[in-house]
């Protein structure tokens, strides 16, 4: 949905009670709402085109690295990948490494979402 810039479909993956900690947050207990994420996604889609998430890796069973087996269904997943985009106005191609911690509720909706990437490094590409 994100790659196709379908904001409605993308946001349908998130619970109304979503707690989102974006890459601009300084601590893991600083959250924004689903509405804040929707506004951020809307802005992002206006600024960039040709989105692609490549080299993805998913780790289930725990959001934190562990060698112990875990059967708790509420432990979430870790997602890693490389995002590629094209700046709408300049046509400049930009990319960044990305990582997310994602937890799902019983309805299959994401109720907590923490995503991480180097915002300053990403923005610096626009001037190089």
Specify the residue positions occupied by each region the protein language model found.
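A solvent-exposed, acidic/Ser-Thr-rich amphipathic alpha-helical stretch
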Residues: 8-75
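Short, surface-exposed coil-to-beta transition loops
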Residues: 93-99
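Low-complexity, intrinsically disordered terminal/linker segments enriched in charged
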Residues: 109-128
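A short hydrophobic beta-strand element
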Residues: 73-83
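Short, solvent-exposed coil/turn segments at beta-strand boundaries
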Residues: 102-110
């Amino acid at each position: 949905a994100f790659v196709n810039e379908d904001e409605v479909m993308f946001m349908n993956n998130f619970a109304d009670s979503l707690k989102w900690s974006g890459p601009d947050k300084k601590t893991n207990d600083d959250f924004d709402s689903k509405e804040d994420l929707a506004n951020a996604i809307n802005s992002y889609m206006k600024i960039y085109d040709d989105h692609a998430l490549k080299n993805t890796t998913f780790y289930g069973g725990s959001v934190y690295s562990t060698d112990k087996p875990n059967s708790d269904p509420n432990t979430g997943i870790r997602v890693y990948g490389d995002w590629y985009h094209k700046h709408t106005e300049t046509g400049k191609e930009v990319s960044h490494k990305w990582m997310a911690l994602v937890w799902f509720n019983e309805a299959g909706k994401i109720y907590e979402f923490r995503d991480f990437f180097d915002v300053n490094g990403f923005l610096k590409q626009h001037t190089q």
